[in-house]
Structure formats: structure tokens, C-alpha cells
Design a protein with these regions (language model features):
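Active-site/acyl-donor-binding loops of N-acyltransferases
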Residues: 143-165, 236, 287-332
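Short loop/turn motifs at secondary-structure junctions and domain boundaries
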Residues: 53-57, 228-233
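Conserved donor-binding loop and adjoining core beta-sheet/short helix segment
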Residues: 22-26, 33-131, 241-269
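Extended hydrophobic/aromatic segments used for targeting, binding, or gating
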Residues: 247-266, 273-281, 286-288, 292-298
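Short amphipathic alpha-helix that is part of the acyltransferase structural core
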Residues: 2-51, 58, 64, 171-217
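Conserved acetyl-CoA-binding loop-helix of GNAT-fold acetyltransferases
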Residues: 102-115, 268, 274-287, 310, ...
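Acyl-donor-binding surface of acyltransferase catalytic domains
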Residues: 1-11, 98-190, 324-328
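Hydrophobic residues within well-ordered alpha-helices
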Residues: 139-140, 263, 311-312
Length: 332
């Protein structure tokens, strides 16, 4: 199987055509995702960067879905290299324009993507529905999928919670100073090895996030492309340093043209957990967002990640719809 979609592969299912997507289709895919969830606009430049920075060792196939030669959505499947996976999990994703979200067309999309994924070696399909998308959840449950786990998403009102956040930040700054931990943005760090250190620490943190599909280590050459994303800047990416070690990071994603501000990634080294480092980092990111005039920020975490969920509650976050993961046995 190719790691990206073979341009010669065109699929047809149930009156729909699936043509291989190119980077130039990323903006359309972002538009479709925005139409599906208007409260969560997706940024076209961000999607193009996402598509352009795929790990070359993974299998990634993306298609534009057409009905009567008219684009109505996109669909994809991907998976890590099988020699790095104990079980052959593969993810299936899609978005259709709201008027095109019918049971029949959804069945055609999943038939096509499941067939491609299975041919690539996937034996457990993973699909996702937002917590308030009852139609999609019902469809998945009726077609052999079962609910596996849920994430929790949160919104923080920076206007209503500003005083509380400022007080918490002052307390955390004092605590970090007393502990000898420096909190600063990446651009101010002069260590020539800082990006490699952030990579190693992030890999350690990602490995410990509760999940069903195991985290697969990312090569530094792939990881470092994150810093070129249009949603992040080095002067808005906060790190924690203890001596020579970088022991934590927290980053907000700022879409350049449209979309909400979300936590992109927060992680800490095992050796500093329980010492308030994640709290200090997250508080600096939202303090900076306040200074930039942002009024709300959002975050999402696995529903079993108790420490970070507790921190979200302390900071004043309120729940919004998260995502539900569904799995389907494809060994038959």
C-alpha cells in the first residue's frame, strides 16, 4: 500500500465517486468540516499544513467525495506502520456537507473507506463522533461499531474568569520560582538542543496519555514540522526548564484566519509531575491569550486523564461536547 493516496485510484460506491485528494483540496475539506460544526470553524491554512506534514512512514489516504461530479465531502483512513503496532488499529474519518448527511451516503463512504483500510491491513476500525452528533453515533452503533472511550472538551471564559486566573498565575509563578523551575517561551530559550529536548519530553508525556490506540513514537524530523504550523509561534509556546532539562510544554493554537483558540498540547516529564508544572504552564498560556485580546479558549482531554481534568475544573473551564471513539472488529 502507498503511504499517500495513489493518484490513479478512483473509487465508486453507491452513486458516489471518491477521487484522491491533493493539498489543494485541504481548503475545501476545511470548509466542509466548518459546515458540519459551525461552532468550530476550521482554518484552511492549518489543514493544508496538517496534510503536508504526514509522517511518511504511515499510510494516509484521503479522498474527495463527489455526487454527480459535485464535491460533497471528503473521507480518509490512516494507520501507523504495522511493525510498530501490536494490534492493527486504523482510523477512518469523513465529513459531508450537512445536506448530504444521509444514512445511504454515509454507508457508501464507510464501505469505501473500510474496504481500503482492510486492504491495507487494518483489522480494527476506529471512527469518531462529536458528543452531540447523535445521528452519527446511532449509525455507527447500528453498523457494527461499539463505543470505546470518550474525551472531554472544555471552554474557558477569559473575561469572566480573568481575576481568578490572574490570582492562580501569581501563585504558580511564586511556586515555580521557589522550586527552581523556569517558565518561559521557546523563543527566549538559548539552548541549541531545545527542540530535541522538547521532542523527547513530549514523547514521554504522549506515551502516558490514556488511550486505546497506543501512541507511536514520532521521528524528530516529523515532530519538528509542528513548529512551522500557521497556528503556533515560538513566542507563544511555553516551556518549563529545570536545570539543563526541559520538563514541560503548553501551547495554544491560534488559527490565522478562522476558528477558535484551543490547547494544542500540554505535557510534562514524569519526574516533575505532581509539582504544579502543568498548571503553571497552562496558566501562562491563558494569561498570554488574555493579553492578546482572546475571550475564550478551549481544551480537550481523554475522559480518564484525571489530573488534567481536575486542573481544568480549578481554572474555571466549563464542559462542551467532546468526542467519542468507536471501534469495529474487521478480522472477519
Amino acid at each position: 500500500m502507498p503511504t499517500t493516496t495513489d493518484p490513479s485510484v478512483t473509487l465508486r460506491r453507491g452513486g458516489l465517486t471518491f477521487r484522491p485528494a491533493t493539498l489543494d483540496d485541504a481548503a475545501f475539506a476545511a470548509d466542509v468540516a466548518t459546515a458540519t460544526h459551525p461552532d468550530e470553524p476550521e482554518d484552511p491554512a492549518s489543514w493544508r499544513h496538517w496534510w503536508s506534514t504526514d509522517d511518511p512512514t504511515w499510510t494516509n489516504e484521503r479522498f474527495i467525495v463527489l455526487r454527480d461530479n459535485t464535491p460533497i465531502g471528503y473521507a480518509r483512513h490512516n494507520h501507523a506502520p504495522w511493525d510498530l503496532m501490536k494490534k492493527r488499529y486504523g482510523r477512518i474519518g469523513f465529513d459531508l456537507l450537512p445536506a448530504e448527511r444521509t444514512d445511504a451516503q454515509l454507508a457508501s463512504v464507510f464501505d469505501a473507506m473500510e474496504e481500503r483500510a482492510h486492504a491495507s491491513g487494518t483489522r480494527i476500525f476506529a471512527a469518531y463522533a462529536r458528543g452531540d452528533d447523535e445521528w452519527l453515533a446511532r449509525w455507527l452503533l447500528a453498523h457494527g461499531y461499539r463505543e470505546e472511550r470518550r474525551s472531554k472538551a472544555w471552554l474557558l471564559d477569559l473575561v469572566a474568569q480573568r481575576q481568578k486566573i490572574e490570582e492562580m498565575a501569581a501563585e504558580s509563578r511564586a511556586k515555580m520560582r521557589a522550586a527552581g523551575i523556569t517558565i518561559q517561551t521557546i523563543d527566549k530559550d538559548t539552548d541549541s538542543e531545545k527542540f530535541h529536548k522538547i521532542h523527547e519530553m513530549s514523547e514521554e508525556a504522549a506515551t502516558d496519555v490514556p488511550t486505546t490506540i497506543p501512541h507511536v513514537r514520532q521521528a524528530f524530523e516529523v515532530f519538528v514540522r509542528w513548529f512551522d504550523a500557521p497556528t503556533v509561534r515560538l513566542d507563544r509556546m511555553w516551556i518549563a526548564r529545570e536545570g539543563d532539562d526541559i520538563v514541560g510544554i503548553s501551547v495554544l493554537s491560534y488559527p490565522p484566519t478562522r476558528g477558535n483558540v484551543w490547547t494544542d498540547w500540554t505535557g510534562t516529564a514524569r519526574k516533575v509531575r505532581g509539582r504544579g508544572v502543568a498548571r503553571a504552564l497552562k496558566l501562562e498560556t491563558v494569561m498570554q491569550a488574555i493579553a492578546l485580546g482572546v475571550t475564550t479558549v478551549r481544551t480537550e482531554n481523554d475522559g480518564e486523564n484525571a489530573p488534567i481534568l481536575h486542573l481544568n475544573e480549578q481554572m474555571g473551564y466549563t464542559p462542551i461536547p467532546g468526542w467519542t471513539q468507536f471501534l469495529k472488529d474487521a478480522t472477519g
